[in-house]
Amino acid sequence: MLTRLREIVEKVASAPRLNEALNILVTDICLAMDTEVCSVYLADHDRRCYYLMATRGLKKPRGRTVALAFDEGIVGLVGRLAEPINLADAQKHPSFKYIPSVKEERFRAFLGVPIIQRRQLLGVLVVQQRELRQYDESEESFLVTLATQMAAILSQSQVTALFGQYRQTRIRALPAAPGVAIATGWQDATMPLMEQVYEASTLDTSLERERLTGALEEAANEFRRYSKRFAAGAQKETAAIFDLYSHLLSDARLRRELFAEVDKGAVAEWAVKKIIEKFAEQFAALTDNYLKERAGDLRTLGQRLLFHLDDSVQGPNAWPERFILVADELSATTLAELPQDRLAGVVVRDGAANSHAAIMVRALGIPTVMGADIQPSVLHRRTLVVDGYRGELLVDPEPVLIQEYQRLISEEIELSRLAEDDVNLPAQLKSGERVKVMLNAGLSPEHEEKLGSRIDGIGLYRTEIPFMLQSGFPSEEEQVAQYQGMLQMFNDKPVTLRTLDVGADKQLPYMPISEENPCLGWRGIRITLDQPEIFLIQVRAMLRANAATGNLSILLPMVTSIDEVDEARRLIERAGREVEEMIGYAIPKPRIGIMLEVPSMVFMLPHLANRIDFISVGTNDLTQYILAVDRNNTRVASIYDSLHPAMLRALSMIAQEAEKHGLDLRLCGEMAGDPMCVAILIGLGYRHLSMNGRSVARVKYLLRHIDFEDAQTLARRSLEAQMATEVRHQVAAFMERRGMGGLIRGGL
């Protein structure tokens, strides 16, 4: 072994560059020790973390850094103790830290030794193997000797120079909620984690049943409390998330299996981990996106149960005065319990646009980025800038950059104040043209009441949300009451109710739909025409609710063909006759329109003029289908861009055909509330925009500061562009010249 050791040291010492030397080292150690994995972690004392610099056997992701904080994992423990650690099964050690990207879950045996030169820790040298065994004394001695030789070869200056490429200061992510935040990164390390729970048994099953019962009750009370809190604050969609958690927690089968596991002798924590993971894996194996998302909800339940089984609770004074939360994953419950007055922003390593957490941060107005490919522990206690407009994270930026972002935040605050000052004025262009600014709504009228004076009506009422909150289909009477509240609240303004739009990422808990390709499957009008009794009950409820107000428009979702329109109209007319027979007098006729979100209907507009009264362009799905991109898939989400030239040309074609055939034209996707898109939409001919409440003030402010001819010129130039980046540069210049760059620019 001494000969082999000398050969390795000589080869490493003769390598021209340090990174090449490290690759030689890990390869030759694997061969010499006949082990499956060898890795070198070098210590960055400025950042207080280890970087995985070279490995043979683990997966080192291309283009990204794998880092561990000094106090994290068994590698961190080796460094802190400054002595070897030899384990037969590393995954059972309390310090074990699972890093999914390196694929080390197959390996059990672990031997780590520190690399120390003149009392200065340079790094940690690690070998691993699948077999459950401790490395023998000769192997440990070999690795310790090699680490000592490596310390003599390495210098701190060499290591520091190598870190330049790993000290990422600007990290690309996905924008989840707009805005800019500057604060200290903070990871809540006190929260009990599922991966830290190991198998354990007890003889006192009655005590464990009592503990489990208490945790279930506390979690249920917590969900009810959060639901009431957010409902009282007019954040009904956020409240609905906790109603869903309560529904999952009350599942009889889940509770039965939890208690059965305890009765077999498991401690409550192990029962929670085993059963929750079992249920979550069943959901995760499904192809349907919505059902896959329920796997995450179940794990959230598990985390909360572990939290209530644990005595160590994060106190309110433990949080910094102002912080940016950094986390691997984010749950709505975690967000709800954070001190909102201290939370400046959020950075999440994993996450999707349709997750409950993403919905909630947007509702709360917290600047957020998701898919930030860096370990949260590396960001802990470091100065961060979150740019929720561009989807960027800056780590320890230079003071001049911090000053610039602070200026942008001040500008953003001032623009918001100006927008609020004018929000009750009409949405009128500088050149005099009126634009209708409508609201996208989803729950009870109380949620939208306070916006009544700011908007011109309800452009989209998502009727599926009340359906999703119940354990079965709501009755006709329940639906009448729901729709009546909205129609009467805005009795002097138009209200558009969309018929039930479920399927794909929106599922009813009592009507699960599992498909291989749900986005292109059984959803929207396809479901309700296949099951006309659901459609008839809902339309009758709408017509009855409209009998006294006469301000109803009915919107049909996911229409693909003319025959679907004809069949839906036939059923609506039938429902009208049934209602008139029921109440004994004629009722107002609603306006009928389609949600234009399937590309096929773009080419069928000439045939719709004598069948419907209006079209409402759903830009979210239309963009998705035109670009063939699943916007909730983090791997391809960056391709999704509503300002893609193909999408703009489709919108232009729709506007021209609608005007030619006398169809009332509306738009209700995210583009309607995005200041980056509004001027182009106006230039293309759109005069009816429906958006979320948080966007109303800014959009109205923007509209009052642009001229129609200028918007037309911008739209014409955008249609000539070949790439979305060209369009965005044109819009940015347009907005900057008019002093409104702060509406679209959160970063540099």
Curated annotation (Swiss-Prot):
The keyword Nucleotide-binding does not apply. Belongs to the PEP-utilizing enzyme family. Residues 128-170 are annotated as: Linker. One of its GO terms (cellular component) is cytoplasm. Its cofactor is Mg(2+). It comes from Salmonella typhimurium (strain LT2 / SGSC1412 / ATCC 700720). The active site is at H356, C668. It catalyses: L-histidyl-[protein] + phosphoenolpyruvate = N(pros)-phospho-L-histidyl-[protein] + pyruvate. The gene is ptsP. The reaction takes place in three steps, mediated by a phosphocarrier histidine residue located on the surface of the central domain. The two first partial reactions are catalyzed at an active site located on the N-terminal domain, and the third partial reaction is catalyzed at an active site located on the C-terminal domain. For catalytic turnover, the central domain swivels from the concave surface of the N-terminal domain to that of the C-terminal domain. Pfam families: GAF (PF01590), PEP-utilisers_N (PF05524), PEP-utilizers (PF00391), PEP-utilizers_C (PF02896). Its EC number is 2.7.3.9. This is Phosphoenolpyruvate-dependent phosphotransferase system. Coiled coil: none annotated. The EI N-terminal domain contains the HPr binding site, the central domain the pyrophosphate/phosphate carrier histidine, and the C-terminal domain the pyruvate binding site. The GAF domain is an important site of signal perception in prokaryotes and eukaryotes.
